[in-house]
Amino acid sequence: MTNPKEKTPMCLVNELARFNRIQPQYKLLDERGPAHSKLFTVQLTLGEQTWQAESTSIKKAQHAAASLALSETTLPKPAARQTKNHMNNNPEAAELHGNTFTSSRHSAKGSITPTVELNGLAMRRGEPAIYRSLDPKPLPNQRANYNYRGMYHQRYLCPMLKTFYVQLTVGNSEFYGEGKTRQAARHNAALKALHALRNEPIPERSSLNGEANRGPEEDKDANKSEISLVFEISLKRNLSLSFEVIKESGPPHMKSFVTRVTVGEFTAEGEGNSKKLAKRRAAAAVLQELRKLPPLPVIEKPRIYIKRRPKNIIKASPEYGQGMNPISRLAQIQQAKKEKEPEYVLLSERGIQRRREFVMQVKVGEETATGTGPNKKTAKRNAAEAMLLQLGYKASSPVVEKTGKRGENPDWDEQNSGIADQTSTPKGILHLSPDVYQEMEASRNKTVPAPAISYLSSKEMNQASSSFFSTSVSQSCTAAIARELLTNGTSPTAEAIGFTGKNLMCHSSTVQPSKQLEYLAGIQGLQVNYSDRQSGNDFLTCLTLSPVQMTFHGIGSSLEASHDQAALSALKQFSEQGLDSVDGSLMAENGPFEQAKLRGEKADNKQANSGTIAQDCKDSKAVV
């Protein structure tokens, strides 16, 4: 349908059905073809007649069937409605139009008056339509008719109808209209303007904006508007620039603006149906004058060297740039354990604007550690370093205070000279360091089971205390003593070795784990330190064994219970150090429940064979 007001075939079929008092019926008969190109077959029934049509959609098939029904039906059709020949139901307007507007145009255009149509055409052309009323023509002088009897008798002198005249201006063209009313005169003038301007081409915007006939040297400014070019020229030549709307006229729906632009000594005006268009035309007019000015001399400006302010952020020690990054190392350790990677959380920011201090927290399983630094990166690094120490690993790199410039401290230079530069790796890829790789291989060969309740794995225990155990009682003896203390409360192995220390004497039936740990520490020559703090109704204990720098944690409702839990974790850690590879592999295959069961059986068997273990421990001590 070219005209949206034209009725569709289905609408005409409905009118035909209402006229004959029947009900039309559409039925979908078939649907075939692929999903992207289906064909639908629709059947239309009107009374006893049927028609079929197919198309690519159901609606199109219905319209096709309705078109067939309209052309082939034998039912009587209703009479067509007559179209209105009067515009806006105004007989005067229809009389003014004469034969210009046919009935078909009325049906297509509806109630569009000539003035409205002319306003649309004028807006497309960018020219305002301005109406101005004119004074009527003077009437001829008529003398009164007096009869011979001396009496005034008026014959056939009825008052003449008044005629209105209107002047219409569209751009540079003027048109005149007349009518019995002022509105009829406006319509008459608009009709004349439509006849004259309808076939004329619409002027191009390039000629309106003053963009035609540009030279090749202006091609570089093709994407810039005239207003931008005027601003650039005024800035380069140090000229004052101002835009001012000096006139505003016309009706509210078709206003006309006049804008004046002043650039130094040059002035120009522009007119348009919007302030933007008037401003652009004024800029285009003054731009023609500015381009006639002589070119500016080329002046090479000297380069300005800006001295950068020194950074007031104190950098961390250069030792942190060497060796293994603690963040990467902690991530590698968690990957080797096949556990969840560390989680970093920013807790707080302290300090003034230029002396910030960030507090970062890292969480590995149930362990947490914090680190501070002047920036988030350093705080994250310190938190990872603290977590490594808390897990029982050595520090990634020693923190050395920088006391002077490079070259002033020979010890610092010699220490850094032996460290190779760290190679850059792609983001997201962590290569295993040699020490972590060796630990993984050693743990695979030994197949030592992980502790059930502890903060240090057996692999970490080997790394932290291997040097100490090599000069004291062997690891198997230490594990045997710890198992005996956990099982019986006393250690026949320690007595067989000949340890003359503090005896485990307690009036109660059981010995506290803290006392047992002190007894074992006396055998090993370790120092036990407790660090306590209270959180609500619970007590938190941090147990440290030196000089091996092992840390265990405990929590309890009382200070004594918290100490006992931390000591119990340490004893369990020591008790799992001496298991042989066969038992370890068996435990790894059976799982946690079987490990606990096997551990109880081993404890009973080890008690019976304490004499043999004691003899082995004596031999190992003698060798040392």
Swiss-Prot record:
Q: Which organism is it from?
A: Xenopus tropicalis (Western clawed frog)
Report which superkingdom the organism of origin falls in: Eukaryota
* UniProt region (Disordered), positions on chain: 197-223, 401-428, 592-624
Provide the gene name from the record: stau2
* Domain (DRBM): residue spans on this chain: 55-122, 142-228, 254-321, 354-422, 540-604
Detail the disulphide connectivity of this chain as listed in its UniProt entry: none
Cross-referenced InterPro entries: DRBM-containing_protein, dsRBD_dom, STAU2_DSRM_1, STAU2_DSRM_2, STAU2_DSRM_3, STAU2_DSRM_4, Staufen_C
Its name, as the record gives it, is: Double-stranded RNA-binding protein Staufen homolog 2
GO MF terms, alphabetically ordered: RNA binding
Note the Pfam families from the entry.
Answer: dsrm (PF00035), Staufen_C (PF16482)
An example Gene Ontology CC term for this record: microtubule
State where composition is biased (Polar residues): 415-426
Q: Which SUPFAM superfamilies does this one have?
A: dsRNA-binding domain-like
